[in-house]
Amino acid sequence: MEVIKITPRGYCYGVVDAMVIARNAALNPTLPRPIYILGMIVHNKHVTDAFEEEGIITLDGPNRLEILENIDHGTVIFTAHGVSPEVKQRAREKGLVTIDATCPDVTKTHDLIREKVENGYEVIYIGKKGHPEPEGAIGVAPHAVHLIETPEDVEQLDIQSKRIIVTNQTTMSQWDVAHIMEKVKEKYPHVEMHREICLATQVRQEAVAEQAKEADVTIVVGDPRSNNSNRLAQVSEEIAGTKAYRVSDVTEIDIEWIKDAKKVAVTAGASTPTPITKEVIDFLEQFDPNNPETWKRERKVPLTKILPKVKKRGE
């Protein structure tokens, strides 16, 4: 079996920055305890488990403001997905120390929404309903931001303003965004289009679109809650034409998927730890469909190998 290691794949700079910020917080004895992360720092359970080992508590739920109400003291880290101004204000009111690990690309979208709304615009925002990134973006101007997810949602919009922009969640499929934006343009010909797919998402999707064409099957290593991981699987199937499966780690690979494959492509979401992906690649490279001894799937990566290294204070 040939393993096609799609490149680029895996960690993006926004994810690495967020994890380094959180690790530095864990190593800083001057910060009030406990230290909480408001939601999953990035959408990968291996990462949140590793932070739990470092004494950082992940509090997850569908609404950041509601989660915050459960915290009365200590330090709060805002995740890479961003939070609304209301969440930041409430944290200040509660006297909490806050650390912002928002991805710069997400901040850029928040700034765009803020600026346009101040100038009288209505904002159509293409994003995944229930995902924390749209939650934060909508929170910038709840009265003026309209969340849509599908072309069908465009038909339900009823915006009378002459000033409209359309923008999007940074981790969406660029092909989906382009298609939905065209639908918006048909309905509102005067709309301003601001595509905000982050570069890391874009190049990873394009790599899958091109490099997965040669494969019989694609394995995407990523958490089920990772939107960008799910979009990579979608791109493999819809753009490259190659059947794709998303797995959290090597233990989730089904032998039926790969036993007849001559070529298997592997990629990973932007929040997937590199050692977890390497374990998948190593398994596939030694796999022999005729030798059941090579079928054993066992995750051996320790949590201590999941997070990026940072220098301890004083080093």
From Swiss-Prot:
It comes from Anoxybacillus flavithermus (strain DSM 21510 / WK1). The active site is at 133 (proton donor). The gene is ispH. Binds 1 [4Fe-4S] cluster per subunit. It catalyses: isopentenyl diphosphate + 2 oxidized [2Fe-2S]-[ferredoxin] + H2O = (2E)-4-hydroxy-3-methylbut-2-enyl diphosphate + 2 reduced [2Fe-2S]-[ferredoxin] + 2 H(+); dimethylallyl diphosphate + 2 oxidized [2Fe-2S]-[ferredoxin] + H2O = (2E)-4-hydroxy-3-methylbut-2-enyl diphosphate + 2 reduced [2Fe-2S]-[ferredoxin] + 2 H(+). Its cofactor is [4Fe-4S] cluster. This is 4-hydroxy-3-methylbut-2-enyl diphosphate reductase. [4Fe-4S] cluster binds at residues 12, 103, 198. The lineage of its organism: Bacteria, Bacillati, Bacillota, Bacilli, Bacillales. Isopentenyl diphosphate binds at residues 43, 81, 131, 226, 228, 271.
